[in-house]
Amino acid sequence: MVEEIKNFKIETAHNHINLYQQCGRLELLSNDNELQSLIDLEKPHKLGLRNLEHLMSVLLFIPRPDRILMLGTAAGSLLHFLRHYYPQSEITAVDIDVELVEKMLQIEVLPPVGNGLTYVYDDAAHFISASTQCYDLVLVDVFSGAQSPAWLLEKSCTNGLYQILGEHGAVAFNLLIDSEHKFKLFYRDLRLVFQRQTLCLPVKGLENTIAFGIRHPLTARDMAWYMDHAMEMSEQLEIDFLQILSVIYNTNPVGAGVI
């Protein structure tokens, strides 16, 4: 990653982005000044936003993923994280905004193509419906303005995501939904499609909601096992998974699905 990046704006047909570098960090803000992504320029693999740390807690519930699909790239903090901690995994990053991705690659903010990483320029909904591949982990980080797009909340999309998961795969959603009713409908459909193998969790201090759908029923584990597993994963990935696990248990009823 380049050491010096001047502050500038990127305007495309899909995004109006402000990029600022300060205090060794790169901040990506929307046109209305909302923080969308944050990268530590010295340690780009270290996640700087709480919602992304919560999103990656899906790793507590699945085997090590060999094939990863990421829908939406933003400034690439998740891609840097995945490339650093899962160097042997094949990662496909899908984004509709060719101009933005090419610019971010040019200034070396996004990790380059190669070593298992591929960029695909496509609409995420189309990619899901047309995919013939199966993935161990699908990360959904797609927005329309400051909200999750309507198509993403439809049951047909949830069905499509279920179909492209491998036997022990999972999908993790980073959601911004301004209506509790809309979220309840989405989560009801998620639980139906994934046969109750789901989790959801709020992100303290942020409006994001994280939701997981896991394709295959997990082996029954008690809280003590998950606490030990969370401590082990915390050391490996530099994320406080114990704190996030506490949120998961406080939000989701035990015996009603995954936990």
Positions of predicted regions on the chain:
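SAM/dcSAM-binding transferase cores
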Residues: 2-27, 35-42, 59, 209-259
